[in-house]
Amino acid sequence: MKNMNTKKITTLIVLAAALVALPACNDFLDEMPDNRTELDSSDKITSLLVSAYSEHTYPVTCEYASDNVDETALVSPDFEPEQEEYYRWQDVTAAVTNEAPQAVWSQYYMAIAAANQALDAIKELGGADTPQLKAAKGEALICRAYAHFVLVNVFCQHYDPAHPDDLGIPYMEKAETELDPKYERGTVAEVYAKIEKDIEEGLPLINDVIY
C-alpha cells in the first residue's frame, strides 16, 4: 500500500512539473530559430531598409580597368595584387578589398535581398496602406532597381538596342525561401525592362514621411 501511495505521489509530481514546463516550452518554440527579427511593424520594415544599400562600391574597380590608369611602374605599399589584375584585364584571383568583383556581386545581391524582404513583409501586413508603408515600398523598389542597375553595368555588356540578347544577370524579385535556388540570367534588355518597371512603380511612392 505504501509503495502504491509513493508511486501515486511521484506521478502527481511529474504531471505537475510537466504542466509548469509546457508554457515555457511554448515560449521557446515561439522564438525564431536564428534570432532574426520578425517584420511585423512599419518601423521594423523601415529599419530593415538600411540594409538595402550596399556597403561596398565598384568605381575603383572600373577605374583601374579604364584608360585613366597608365602607370604601373611605381607600386605603393598599399597596392593590392588585384588592382594590377584590373589594369591588365586579367581574371581577378587575388580579391581582398571591398571593391573586388566578388564583394560587389555578393554585397549588391544582399542589398537586393533586404529590399525583397521588406516588400514581402509589406504584403504580409496587408499592403502599403499607410504613408509610412507606401514610402517604404517605394524605397525598397528603388533600391532593388539601383542594385540591379549596378550589377548589370559592372558584370554585363552595356545596353545596346542593336544587341538586345546580350546575357544579363538574375533579377531577384522575391525573397529566397529555399537553399541554393537556381535562376535564369535573362538578357540585358530584360534586366533594364525590370529596372524601369521598379522605378516607375516605386518613384511615385517615395516621400519624406519615414526620414
Give a label for each model feature:
Residues D70-T72, A136, I142-C143, M172:
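Acidic helix-start/capping segments at beta-turn-to-alpha-helix junctions
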Residues C25-D27, A115, A145, I195:
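Terminal processing/anchoring signals of secreted or surface-associated proteins
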Residues T61-Y86:
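N-terminal, post-signal-peptide region of Sec/Tat-exported proteins
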Residues C25-V69:
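Membrane-proximal, proline-rich intrinsically disordered regions
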Residues E84-F155, G186-A189, E201-I210:
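Conserved, well-structured interaction surfaces
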Residues M1-C25:
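Sec-dependent bacterial lipoprotein signal peptides
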